[in-house]
Amino acid sequence: MIRLKIISSIIALLILVKGYSQNITNPFETFKKKKEIVYGIDNRRTHIYQHHTVIYGLYSGIGFGKKLRFKIGINGTPFEIGKFVDGNGFIKKNQLFFASLGEEFDFYQYKKFGITTYLQAGIGSNFYRQLNQNGTEVNKGKERIIPIETGLHFSYDILTYFKLKTGFGWRFVMPNNSRDLSGYYVKLGLGFNLKKFNETKTEQ
């Protein structure tokens, strides 16, 4: 149900901004723009089966015209997550680590407000432990995971070099034995552009 609501919200927002098509960027035009190296932090808060946690990420890649970015990243949960209980009463705790390829496209801009599409696919492992009801470890191992994340992100320019960022989306995890690791994610943070900050100081 939560997944359906998130996907429906994304579709509704895309339909809404279509009415302001004069503010929508053509993705093919951005390839003609100046290229640059991009890098940063890609943390997102998420919910994994009764457990609120954070997936931490670092990325680097190439950007076009400050609108379109292709990224390579590493992502993981340094702490064990999830509260899965099987038919034998064993608790399964999980620790994720995966590499990813993704894109971000700032397709809509109206004055200081912007909307960005987010799509990322990865491959990695879930390092898990199984504990009995007494907390004793009875099994451990790792499973292949293929997470795919998609969502919409929003930004508001507080200053030319300082912006508020937020967003939401859904993470699908394959294969079937890892589907319980799927869930929504939300992002909230601040963006600081050092280059624009230095340009502002130089102009002063």
Describe the predicted segments one by one:
Residues 35-37, 52-56, 93-99, 113, ...:
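Residues that define the transmembrane beta-barrel architecture of outer-membrane proteins
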Residues 31-37, 66-70, 111-117, 160-164, ...:
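Outer-envelope beta-barrel architecture signal
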Residues 66-135, 146, 156-158:
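Gram-negative (and chloroplast) outer-membrane scaffold detector with strong preference
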